[in-house]
A protein has these predicted regions:
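A short acidic, amphipathic alpha-helical/loop segment
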Residues: 19-22, 47, 138-143
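Active-site mouth loops of central-metabolism enzymes
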Residues: 1, 36-58, 99
Length: 212
């Protein structure tokens, strides 16, 4: 009824990819695909902690995509899961992942390089850190800078456009965000689907899911 010809499951946990493809198979007529979630997996964080080179990590990411049968990579709160487990409610791009000694920026930068070097057709699909928090527009701007000119897609940007000005410490950062997006031609975005009726949230953003 909505006219979709293609749908993409944007958060496939590689370990569950077989089940995802079985469920997608039950959807008739339209084209289907999935994006493999990376950026909080222990193996990748351990590789970065041990300073494995880019080729080593590229091989791991290629192996993950081949075996999950996914179209591309999705990064959700890069490194933020480990921080959340320890009680944190915010995790910015230059914060360090507990126990691993690497920043969220380093994780994002490394996966972005892999996406380009492996010539994955879909740009790196990113769910920025600090979704829904006042002042998170700074995190979104830092994320765009971290791409360093490489192609990157920011998902549901309406939730990253919050500044922290005004009496209540909450304001629109939409102008700052749109100026940066327009200036950086490597960046694409989607606004994010808004449903105006009761919804059920199922998200790999464990902080937001926890608070929902």
């Amino acid at each position: 009824e909505m006219g979709f010809t293609t749908v993409v499951e944007p958060a496939v946990l590689p370990i569950n990819s077989f089940s995802v493809h079985l469920e997608l198979e039950n959807i008739p007529l339209i084209d289907k695909a999935g994006l493999a979630v990376m950026g909080n997996d222990t193996f990748l964080l351990d590789c970065l902690n041990k300073k494995k080179d880019q080729d080593y990590i590229n091989n791991y990411i290629a192996w993950t995509l081949i075996n999950s049968k996914c179209l591309g990579i999705k990064v959700i709160n890069a490194g933020g899961s480990e921080s959340f487990k320890r009680g944190s409610r915010e995790f910015s791009l230059d914060d360090t992942v507990p126990s691993y000694g690497v920043t969220s920026r380093k994780i994002l930068n490394t996966i972005s390089k892999a996406n380009e070097q492996l010539k994955i057709p879909h740009p790196l699909h990113v769910h920025c850190n600090n979704l829904g928090l006042p002042g998170n527009v700074k995190t979104a701007l830092d994320t765009i800078d971290a791409a360093e000119g490489r192609k990157m897609h920011l998902a549901h940007v309406q939730f990253y456009g919050y500044d922290d000005e005004g009496k209540k410490g909450f304001s629109s950062g939409a102008v700052k965000l749109t100026e940066s997006i327009n200036k950086n031609k490597n960046i694409t975005v989607d606004v994010g689907q808004v449903m105006f009726k009761p919804t059920v949230t199922i998200s790999s953003d464990i902080l937001r899911q926890f608070e929902a």
